[in-house]
Amino acid sequence: SCELHNSKKSKDDEFLMTCMAGVVGNNFLGYFHTHTKVKRAIIRKGQAFRNTILEEIQETHFKNENGVSFPVLIGRPNFDRLYSCFKNIAYGLYYHKFGKRFEGESQIMMDFLTFEDEQTEKIKLLVRKRLEEETEKPEIEGANPEIFSYAFYRPDEFGLISLVMTFYQGSKVLVAFKETGIKEPFNLTMKLINSGVKTHVEFDDGTDFEFN
């Protein structure tokens, strides 16, 4: 049982590094890992392994803000496996932070992905903006922040806890924890959005999100 668990964890660690290291916008260490550890894994395991990371792969070029063009791969990630990895990490961090197992419901948003569905993409950007606008900034934790760091926000007025996990200083995963016994607050904005009503969400800096 222990060997099976360790084997699965090792495979998940390799899968996660392969997925995350090369995301556009990450730091130099992510780029370095992509061209060393990740490249060796792909060469060793072949095309079948690459297909477990991305499906419908397209090779293209991306031009950064400095006008430098470099090759990238675009495709559909293994969403379910990524979700499972991020959930395991988030629950482990919750236990480490609060000294107890998390019991309740959680929601995970992969901020580093670009979603084909326009509404999902806008909701992602809205959640990102709201966290950026928080006046009380959380403590950033992690022994090796160039590879991974995380930050827990203080519980809001409803008792909901937000967590931001950052890989290679560029790829963020947003997690919301709702412990058992906490009543989910009524959210008029999301109710209107989900009902198909045209909705605007505006911020003090003039940023405006339009839905439907």
PLM-predicted stretches and their roles:
Residues 7, 30-45:
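Short Fe-S-cluster ligation motifs
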Residues 16, 28-31:
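N-terminal accessory/assembly segment that mediates macromolecular interactions
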Residues 21-26:
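Intrinsically disordered, low-complexity regulatory regions of eukaryotic proteins
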Residues 67-212:
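C-terminal, charged low-complexity interaction regions
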Residues 38-79:
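Short flanking/linker segments adjacent to small metal-binding domains or redox-active Cys/His motifs
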Residues 5, 33-35, 61, 96, ...:
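Histidine (H) residue identity feature
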